[in-house]
């Protein structure tokens, strides 16, 4: 799918053409703030008038910072020339575009002059100011440009006024963020970089969203549940004498975020009726509190972006501008992923090929993906995924390609993406990252089932192509959940430290001088955290290991992340942190599925599981006779791969690592594309007919999943690797400690993928040799202020009764004494 804007040309100025365009007023979108004052002249009519006026640039004078902008907007002399060039480019773009997407009449465009809202001395209200720069004024204190933590902008377009309230997205860059470029053939590294990337909302519009960068004008988008608006500055139309910078703004229908989508994280997949036809997405119910679910827990995808040489040349041969473009794109992607997938996209590095391309740039994305995968293995920076942005037009049906489910892998956690406008690249990058996360493309036949029919914008992973979509369908979200449940994405659970900016309360990262930081208010429990300080008596404010009523750590051994399968490891609280430990799984080679499978990369690999994943729940692996009979023949029906036009015979030792043979195949695979036809084969063996069918099923990255997966068992203590059957010991994995009897982890634990012992419930130590007493896993409930006990009540009652009796008896005795005195007092008058 190639989104609009994937071409390197500037966007068209439709909706403000100088001939034949309607310049009448337009109705504003629902939820936008109507412009005050008299009706505003439409931008196209204003442009015609201003272009006919004598040039005013020479008479303009630079004003001091903070001076008010004049009431009339000002356009410089180059505007008309550049608008003509842009119009020509628009015609060329629409005539020559290879995209399979039709430009919709619903898209509208205008020219606007945005302004930043500031406060003047002795004024209580904001006023518009034409300078859009958000750099803090006292830069000499810092070794890099520092931008304001908060900013507001006013944009008038389509008959409405929008006020955008922004907060610096301090979750975008990690503390280890580095920028790389080349000089004299050698890489040059620099820590940090300019950070001008904001998230926010439209003032007064509920559930609105904004993602903008302000490094060089305004780049990005905002939406109000009805329309999506894309904004960027017009190139070469602005100079220092200008009183305002023209921007082009596009309006198109937004994806409708239904209530079901907003509440999706609280629902179980098997509650949706359409999933009866998506059985492969279903998994067992998890006996764990949903608040500790692996999908609901926030995840962090650490991303590295690489820009090719043509992308660098496009940005005026400035690696700073090129890097800013990449950061702007990732800022947009992060705004999509964190809301719908509970996943933050954190940029750890940007590399720009300033001198030459480091790999061959071709129009064949499959070839380029394979070459880039080899290059990625030479990169030293840690990243969960590395993606290339290339200013090339692929001879391919889509604008990106990545390895399906490849995140966390140094060889497969990569992707290649076409360059274009920021919003278009953000959508392309969202799609290729989704492929890395096990999310499939959605053919049009699945669109009604996946709930992508509510809006013109469609969904991100639609195969037919959509324009500026920001919505993942139900199917996509369930596939991501399924990917996590199968053990994928283990690297996504290590929370990176906050970026290099100064400490700021409210960004969601606990920094120097802070005890807690709620970020968005919903991230903290109750009253545990106030102004980035823990409340009196509180030990924590958030996380699966923080008691949400007492604000105390859960006890050591309290389960905080359930194992999602036999090859996963349950994580337990440490007793001294509110956060759950990193997500680990068993080391490759452990037996699973009743000794029928082997753990590999956190998944239980069996031929049955692979057949069901490709062909549905009724499929199963064929009888061993099929593999021994067919894979030794070296034909289309059975082989160990292909060398040119020749099928490779499997040795008898490797027959279970060759062509995948299954029973009960469906007409079409659940993933990938069928290459050729299904090869039905059957034999009469030991008094019964056995099914030995197979097929070549190819993913977009050219991977043929019609062969037995790596990690699948092929004999006692043996597993497949690169279509060879190898001893597990030959994999040279790091080993965990052994006891004197040679038992791993003393026989009281399992070895993790980090070669550390995860001990059983009552054992501890690096080798699990120390007996640990049973822990209290159920912390006492918060009972509030302690009241009197039953014993104290009884004692108090008895004491009270004795005291009352004493008072009564004493009073009676005193009264009796007085009676006696009155009876025998000789001075007393009257009868007795």
UniProtKB/Swiss-Prot annotation:
The chain crosses the membrane at residues 793-813. Residues 299-496 form the Peptidase M12B domain. GO terms for cellular component: extracellular region; glutamatergic synapse; plasma membrane; presynaptic membrane. Glycans are attached at residues 76, 96, 100, 263, 547-548, 664, 732. May play a role in cell-cell and cell-matrix interactions. This is a non-catalytic metalloprotease-like protein. This is Disintegrin and metalloproteinase domain-containing protein 23. It is found in: Cell membrane. Changing residue 566 to A: Significantly lower of adhesion-promoting activity. It is a single-pass type I membrane protein. GO terms for biological process: cell adhesion; cellular response to leukemia inhibitory factor; central nervous system development; proteolysis. One of its GO terms (molecular function) is integrin binding. Keywords: Cell adhesion, Cell membrane, Cleavage on pair of basic residues, Disulfide bond, EGF-like domain, Glycoprotein, Membrane, Secreted, Signal, Transmembrane, Transmembrane helix. Residues 1-10 have a biased composition (Polar residues). Residues 502-588 form the Disintegrin domain. Residues 287-792 are extracellular. Residues 732-769 form the EGF-like domain. A conserved motif AVN[ED]CD within the disintegrin-like domain could be involved in the binding to the integrin receptor. Residues 1-37 are annotated as: Disordered. Residues 60-286 form a propeptide. CDD domains: ZnMc_adamalysin_II_like. Can bind to LGI1 and LGI4. Ligand for integrin alpha-V/beta-3. Pfam families: ADAM_CR, Disintegrin, EGF_2, Pep_M12B_propep, Reprolysin. Residues 563-568 are annotated as: May bind the integrin receptor. It comes from Homo sapiens. The lineage of its organism: Eukaryota, Metazoa, Chordata, Craniata, Vertebrata. Residues 814-832 are cytoplasmic.
